Amino acid sequence: RLTREIYEVLSTSRGASKRREKRIDKLILGYYTPQRIREIKRTWKDSDLEPHIKKILGQALEAHLRGEYALSIACLSTMWEGLIHHKLHITGRYSQKKTGRDFTELIKENDLKPVFGEFYEKLIVCDCNTVDEVVEGIPNRNGVSHSKYKKYPNKKASLNAILIADFIIHLEPKQETEEHSNGQTENAQP
């Protein structure tokens, strides 16, 4: 239903405009009702994440439902990289560059378009050194971590933070591999 309605807006619009963006935002924000957010919370509870991580994520969703969007965004944006590491079976220190590269590979392994990885690299974990670099509605981890806010974050930005986390949580994990002393890898036995 939502996809059909968005296509309707796209097909009846004369091109990219603020009006079209607002119409699409209204559809998406209307679709993600408090009930749908609670459904997301239930699916996260059923995930393979550690109980304390599930609790943190659940509290971020509750903050969103209460209209405390800054809390939701601040929490979730700092969790994304850890969630990605969980999917990649990374337990130690790992560079952001390698994480981004391996995340893009994981997205491909899940038969999804690489644009999701590019979105993550270019808008989510990229540097945000000034308030002017903030893109409204898109929660940038670096910007959030360093208080680069033009104004109080809105519901759209909070929902985007939730949907990014949900996207990561629902990816199939990377096939575990074993690295041999010669640097070669092969699939590990379960």
Segments and roles (model prediction):
Residues 1-43:
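Internal, Lys/Arg-enriched amphipathic helical interaction segments that engage polyanionic partners
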Residues 21, 37, 100, 116-117:
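Alpha-helix initiation and N-capping motif
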Residues 37-43, 53-60, 140-147:
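Glycine-rich, often proline-containing surface loops adjacent to acidic residues and nearby aromatics
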Residues 44-49, 103-139:
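Short, mixed-charge amphipathic alpha-helical segments
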Residues 125-190:
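Charge-enriched, short contiguous segments at helix-coil
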